[in-house]
Curated annotation (Swiss-Prot):
Known outcome of mutating I280A: Loss of arginine-binding. Constitutively inhibits the TORC1 signaling pathway
Compartments where found: Cytoplasm, Cytosol
Family the UniProt entry places it in: Belongs to the GATS family.
Residues involved in L-arginine binding: S111, V112, G274, I280, V281, T300, F301, N302, F303, D304
Name used for this protein in its record: Cytosolic arginine sensor for mTORC1 subunit 1
Keyword Phosphoprotein appears in the UniProt entry: yes
Cysteine-cysteine disulfides: none
InterPro entries, alphabetized: ACT-like_dom_sf, CASTOR1_ACT-like, CASTOR1_N, CASTOR_ACT_dom, CASTOR_fam, CASTOR_mTORC1
Gene name tied to this protein: CASTOR1
Gene3D superfamilies from the UniProt entry: VC0802-like
Superkingdom of this protein's organism: Eukaryota
Post-translational modification summary for this protein: Phosphorylation at Ser-14 by AKT1, promoting the interaction between CASTOR1 and RNF167. Ubiquitinated by RNF167 via 'Lys-29'-polyubiquitination, leading to its degradation, releasing the GATOR2 complex. Ubiquitination by RNF167 is promoted by phosphorylation at Ser-14 by AKT1.
Native species: Homo sapiens (Human)
Length: 329
């Protein structure tokens, strides 16, 4: 398998809900006029707490500093795994890279963020951790770094500085999980038809906020949750929304897999997770991979979210609770 280090240098930000008005114009520009900003990596995820943005340096320039904007300190690099076989299962998601990428990085104390899209899975690592990433994964993967759009082979010698890293550390924190009742769909869209849904998209993202109060509460099982993720990365669009929100969009423009599968969410974290802890993704992806359960995984500024097939949510909760009990004992 090949591991590609993409050219994007990504910043991770949080826009507080009360300050959304200040960012409506630049966000609309990034959403609908990417050529104007030259942004090639744009992801916006709405949660009950805030709006998380993952944007490259060109996109970051569009966002003015303010009291409503929090910026994670690190610059993140984007990794992508490609398999030589063209028969990859469309919705395997984070499960297919849990053992080969996520677990080894957790063992070497590399903090990762995940962004699963309709098309692929992006793994974000801090720029300063790249040497450890390469050293850790070089045996498993042919590693290439994109330079000027062309893949250049990376050897382990290129990454010898700062390695090895201490391999012992505290046991992973056991984070609580919740499973809201929403049913989600993972969709794509031909970029040429994006203008046709622009009005609806703007309404859903910026003006539709009649969320049940329990969605943002600390109750163990919120009945529903505000969650909408849109990404436009290298010309490909991916949208995650709940089935009720999907009804607002013209059905003939949104494309999904032939099965039209619906997904349920597992939300990870009781308190904001931060960016320094390692192994959070592995805590979820590992057990799902062992049980051969497909999952999309989306990290946000405060919490993590896994999407699993609707008909398997009961067994997923059981698997993860068993894992939690094992870690806690």
């Amino acid at each position: 398998m090949e591991l590609h280090i993409l050219e994007h240098r990504v910043r991770v930000l949080s826009v507080a809900r009360p300050g959304l008005w200040l960012y409506t114009h630049p966000l609309i520009k990034l959403l609908f006029l990417p050529r104007r900003s030259r942004c090639k990596f744009f992801s916006l995820t709405e949660t009950p707490e805030d709006y998380t943005l993952m944007v490259d340096e060109e996109g970051f320039k569009e966002l003015p500093p303010s009291e409503f904007l929090q910026v994670a300190e690190a610059t993140w690099l984007v990794l992508n795994v490609s398999s030589h076989s063209g028969a990859a299962v469309q919705a395997a998601g984070v499960t297919k890279i849990a053992r080969s990428v996520i677990a080894p990085l957790a063992e070497h104390h590399v903090s990762v963020l995940m962004l699963s899209t309709y098309q692929t899975d992006f793994i974000l690592v801090r720029e300063q951790d790249l040497s450890v990433v390469i050293h850790t994964l070089a045996q498993e993967f042919d590693i290439y770094r994109e330079v000027g759009g062309e893949p250049v082979p990376v050897t382990r010698d290129d990454s010898s500085n700062g390695f090895p890293r201490t391999q012992h550390g505290p046991s992973p924190t056991v984070h609580p999980i919740q499973s809201p009742q929403n049913r989600f769909c993972v969709l794509t869209l031909d970029p040429e038809t994006l203008p046709a849904i622009a009005t609806t998209l703007i309404d859903v993202l910026f003006y539709s906020h009649s969320t049940p109060k329990e969605a943002a509460s600390s109750s163990p099982e919120p009945s529903s949750i505000t969650f909408f993720a849109f990404s436009l990365i290298e010309g490909y669009i991916s949208i995650v929304m709940d089935a009720e929100t999907q009804k607002k969009f013209p059905s003939d423009l949104l494309l999904t897999s032939s099965s039209g599968e619906l997904w349920r969410m597992v939300r990870i974290g009781g308190q904001p997770l931060g960016f320094d802890e390692c192994g959070i993704v592995a805590q979820i992806a590992g057990p799902l991979a062992a049980a051969d359960i497909s999952a999309y995984y989306i990290s946000t500024f405060n919490f993590d979210h896994a999407l699993v097939p609707e008909d398997g949510i009961g067994s997923v909760i059981e698997v993860l609770q068993r894992r939690q009990e094992g870690l806690a004992s």
